[in-house]
Curated annotation (Swiss-Prot):
Annotated motif Nuclear localization signal, positions: 357-360
Subcellular localization, as worded in the UniProt entry: Host nucleus; Virion
Top-rank taxon: Viruses
Region (LXCXE motif): 32-36
Descriptive protein name: Protein C42
GO CC entries: host cell nucleus; virion component
Subunit structure and binding partners: Forms a complex with proteins E27 and p78/83. The interaction with p78/83 mediates nuclear translocation of P78/83. Interacts with protein Ac102. Interacts with IE0.
UniProt similarity note: Belongs to the baculoviridae C42 protein family.
Major location (coarse): host cell
Length: 361
């Protein structure tokens, strides 16, 4: 094979696998282009990294093609083949969110597959909001953050962004040291995702984005859900009302509410024997004691209650709110093992203590 033909083959391989030509194997192949060099020595680690990169690139290409086909079916541009009624969806792991599907697993319905276009739009909007010094009235949710991280993980082009944001999961650490090639790759990924000119994206923008995501990941709001029950009617009321009037007015609607989640009878807790994963999970939840979780839940209940009172123009009575915690106080009081448990129970039930003097009739 001539040097020109060999160069064309290497260039064709570069365009398919590594267009920026950043892998370490390319400089080691250049001596083959010289006539006096008929052999080349390759490092084993470099060759293994090259093969792993090729395999990962091929797998991501297959996943992107499948996502494009699934989005085409979800958009109604193709005929969807009805799945048999007896077919059951593939069981999804409870904890391992990023696990790839098994090749032998049954095919899922098209509406359950991931639409990568929607994930990309969510990632672009959120990174634009956290990177640039601009204001936006858009309301972002926790699902947007999850969709952003899933997209960055699945995409080979933006995987460097995921690696950078992954360093903020544990604590507020400094940005890791990067070479000039890694910095250029990261900046190119941000420019490509945001579709912004090169003059507005620099390393300072990346630092702002990383610190913003760090505050987002370590925020207690990301760990506890916030539930607000609102009506479909107007949210403002001119006349001041009371809690009793609201219960009478909304009683029928509250009774008609149905649960939105259910558990199948055959659902089982999956067994996980990955010791490293369990250690990382325990390290993550260890700094958060149970009392702190209850405190955050009570704090969320308080703010949710105040928002509902404000929306309904209802008079706030502190005793109505304290009724929520009376049951917990009684449980804590009777959990203490002492000799006065029976007397306290009688007092709680409205019965006098057996040691007290009884009134004779």
């Amino acid at each position: 094979m001539s040097a020109i033909a060999l160069y064309l083959e290497i260039n064709k391989l570069r365009l398919k696998i590594d267009e920026p030509m950043q892998l370490a194997i390319w400089p080691q192949l250049f001596p083959l282009l010289c006539d006096e060099h008929q052999s080349v020595q390759l490092n084993t680690d470099v060759l293994i990294n090259f093969m792993m990169h090729v395999a990962r690139k091929s797998q991501n290409t297959i996943l992107n093609n499948n996502a494009a086909i699934a989005s085409q079916y979800a958009a109604g541009n193709a005929d969807v083949v009805a799945a048999p009624a007896s077919a059951q969806p593939t069981p999804r792991p409870v904890i391992n969110l990023f696990a790839r599907a098994n090749a032998a697993a049954p095919a899922q319905p098209s509406e359950e597959l991931i639409n990568m276009r929607r994930y990309r739009n969510a990632a672009r909007k959120l990174i634009h909001h956290y990177s640039l010094n601009s204001t936006s009235s858009t309301e972002y949710k926790i699902s947007d953050v999850v969709m952003t991280m899933i997209f960055l993980l699945r995409s080979e082009k933006y995987h460097s962004l995921f690696k950078l944001l992954e360093t903020t999961f544990d604590d507020y650490t400094c940005r890791p040291q990067m070479t000039q090639v890694q910095t250029d790759t990261l900046l190119d990924a941000v420019r490509s995702l945001l579709e912004m000119p090169s003059t507005t994206i620099d390393l300072t923008t990346v630092d702002i984005m990383r610190s913003s995501f760090a505050r987002c990941f370590n925020s207690p709001i990301m760990r506890y859900a916030k539930i607000v029950l609102l009506q479909n009617v107007a949210l403002q009321r001119d006349k001041r009302t009371t809690l009793e009037e609201l219960l009478i007015e909304r009683g029928e609607k509250i009774q008609m509410l149905q649960p939105q989640q259910y558990i199948n009878s055959g659902t089982e807790i999956p067994f996980c024997d990955d010791a490293e994963f369990l250690n990382r999970l325990l390290k993550h939840i260890d700094p958060y004691p149970l009392s702190r979780m209850y405190y955050n839940a009570a704090n969320t209940m308080f703010y949710t209650t105040m928002e509902n009172y404000a929306v309904s123009n209802c008079k706030f009575n502190i005793e109505d709110y304290n009724n929520i915690f009376k049951v917990m106080e009684n449980i804590r009081k009777h959990s203490n093992k002492n000799s006065n448990d029976q007397d306290e129970l009688n007092i709680y039930l409205g019965v006098q203590s057996s040691n007290a003097k009884r009134k004779k009739y």
